[in-house]
């Protein structure tokens, strides 16, 4: 069964294209080896790759690719060879060599859309659907990853700008961090209760000094002043 479009001509005056239509691998190879252009087109802009792919001749597709055929070539309607495919192995070959499964022709149709219109084998439809789904998932993962990278870069840039605009703040944060570390080490070395006792003794000494200097006992009202 042929999977090219309606009104397709089975005859052409271009030997290489006719060999691709006929599925003649050996003749195609001889023509390519003799110097035939692997990207030569018919009157509708189709290359040998289009014609071979439409008939499921994956061996000729591989041969054309080996001799430099453009896998991304489109006909005058914007169809790639993948748009004309109706065979699993040919689709797998083209996709594995870089053709995008979700590429659209000039009418906005993807290979899957055209395959459904032509009523191709269900295995082919399932393969195309699976490949499209993988393409969408891969795009979503890539987009999410790029957004995360951009957000991280923006955050780091903002922090760097803030530090440059506030050098004193950055220096103060460094001093505070150093003091906090020193205090923690001091408490760990001396012990919590000893530190608490030391603070209590210092507080009592402070009260005693204040009383000696002012003659007034702190926190106690209406005291007579001492005469020295």
From Swiss-Prot:
A single Pfam family it belongs to is Ank_2
Coiled coil feature spans: none
Q: Which UniProt keywords apply?
A: ANK repeat, Membrane, Repeat, Transmembrane, Transmembrane helix
Q: Kindly list the places in or outside the cell where this protein is found, as annotated in its UniProt entry.
A: Membrane
What's the protein's topology in the membrane? Single-pass membrane protein
Top-level division of the source organism's lineage: Eukaryota
A GO CC annotation recorded here is: membrane
Enumerate the transmembrane spans: 190-210
Kindly indicate whether the keyword Repeat belongs to this entry: yes
- Start-end of the ANK repeats? 11-40, 44-73, 77-103, 107-138
Q: What is its main location?
A: membrane
Please give the PANTHER family that the UniProt record associates with this protein.
ANKYRIN REPEAT DOMAIN-CONTAINING PROTEIN 60 (PTHR22677), USHER SYNDROME TYPE-1G PROTEIN-LIKE PROTEIN (PTHR22677:SF4)
Q: What is this protein called?
A: Ankyrin repeat domain-containing protein 46
Organism this protein belongs to? Homo sapiens (Human)
């Amino acid at each position: 069964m042929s999977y090219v479009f309606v009104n397709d001509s089975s005859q052409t005056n271009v030997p290489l294209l006719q060999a691709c239509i006929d599925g003649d691998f050996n003749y195609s190879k001889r023509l390519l080896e003799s110097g035939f252009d692997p990207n030569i087109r018919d009157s509708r802009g189709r290359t040998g790759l289009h014609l071979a792919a439409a008939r499921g001749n994956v061996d000729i597709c591989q041969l054309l690719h080996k001799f430099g055929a453009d896998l991304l070539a489109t006909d005058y309607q914007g169809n790639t060879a993948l748009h004309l495919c109706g065979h699993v192995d040919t689709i797998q070959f083209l996709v594995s060599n870089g053709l995008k499964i979700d590429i659209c022709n000039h009418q906005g149709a993807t290979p899957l859309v055209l395959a459904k219109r032509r009523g191709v084998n269900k295995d082919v439809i399932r393969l195309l659907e699976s490949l499209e789904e993988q393409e969408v998932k891969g795009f979503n993962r890539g987009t999410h990853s790029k957004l995360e990278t951009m957000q991280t870069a923006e955050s780091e840039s903002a922090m760097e700008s803030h530090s440059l605009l506030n050098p004193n703040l950055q220096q103060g944060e460094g001093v505070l961090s150093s003091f906090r570390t020193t205090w923690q080490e001091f408490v760990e070395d001396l012990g919590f209760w000893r530190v608490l006792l030391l603070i209590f003794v210092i507080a009592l000494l402070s009260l005693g000094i204040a009383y000696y200097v002012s003659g007034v006992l702190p926190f106690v009202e209406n005291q007579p002043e001492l005469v020295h």
